[in-house]
């Protein structure tokens, strides 16, 4: 009989063999088969990623159930299926709060899931809102302006160079070497293009040159633990000055 803690606030399980853990995910191949393009599905996962997660959980002695994406989760819940815990890596497809949809649904059914809750997911996907909260908390973040319409472009009063990207995307979607902006003409061109393509506001911020790192953190406050640090180094044939969609999509070559 053991006690095991999962990365969910205050969640402990005492068990003699296993915990039934549901896996929620967006499988990229499924969406490509439905006709979605590669950029739209850029954040979604591959089969080998799901296999690796499932193997790791099973190696810890737990039972796994593959659920799938949001609509598949809705169907399973309607059928009366339940799990002790859900390991959620769903990105979602529709809406600016799409990453919060699976956690919110599970909260309604009182089924715990790993990682952030629905509120945190909704706040952090919107980079403008995230930066506003960080700034008001007194933490350093690059000066920024959120461009919601073409008319807002003239309101940007930040010195060049600037960096522009969709306010609520990931995996480099909407990011390219053109994202580094050095003139008012470039600012209008890039923002207009992003507003039309992604149908959401554009985050414009002071360009920060230099080295780029990704730091994995598990937990909150005093319980936070750094899992590892990764430095992004672009090769000579990569798009420069930006960890772009192309660089991420073709990472093995870049």
Label the model's feature ranges.
Residues 184-254:
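Phosphate-binding site of ATP-dependent enzymes
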């Amino acid at each position: 009989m053991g006690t095991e803690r999962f990365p969910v606030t205050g969640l402990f399980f005492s068990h003699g063999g296993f915990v039934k853990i549901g896996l929620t995910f967006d499988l990229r191949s499924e969406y490509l088969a439905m006709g979605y393009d590669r950029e739209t599905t850029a954040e979604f996962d591959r089969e080998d990623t799901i296999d690796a997660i499932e193997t790791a959980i099973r190696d810890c002695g737990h039972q796994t159930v593959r659920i799938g994406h949001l609509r598949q989760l809705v169907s399973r819940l309607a059928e009366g299926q339940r799990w002790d815990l859900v390991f959620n890596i769903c990105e979602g497809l529709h809406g600016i709060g799409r990453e919060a949809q699976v956690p919110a649904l599970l909260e309604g059914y009182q089924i715990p899931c790993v990682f952030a809750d629905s509120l945190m997911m909704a706040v952090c996907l919107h980079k403008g809102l995230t930066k506003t909260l960080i700034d008001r908390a007194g933490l350093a973040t690059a000066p920024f302006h959120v461009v919601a319409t073409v008319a807002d472009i003239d309101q940007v009063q930040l010195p060049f160079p600037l960096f522009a990207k969709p306010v609520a995307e990931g995996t480099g979607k909407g990011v390219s070497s053109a994202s580094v902006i050095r003139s008012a003409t470039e600012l209008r061109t890039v923002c207009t293009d992003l507003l039309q393509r992604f149908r959401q506001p554009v985050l414009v911020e002071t360009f920060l040159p230099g080295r780029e790192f990704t730091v994995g953190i598990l937990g909150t406050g005093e319980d936070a633990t750094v899992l590892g640090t990764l430095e992004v180094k672009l090769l000579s044939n990569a798009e420069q000055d930006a960890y772009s969609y192309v660089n991420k999509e073709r990472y093995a070559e870049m």
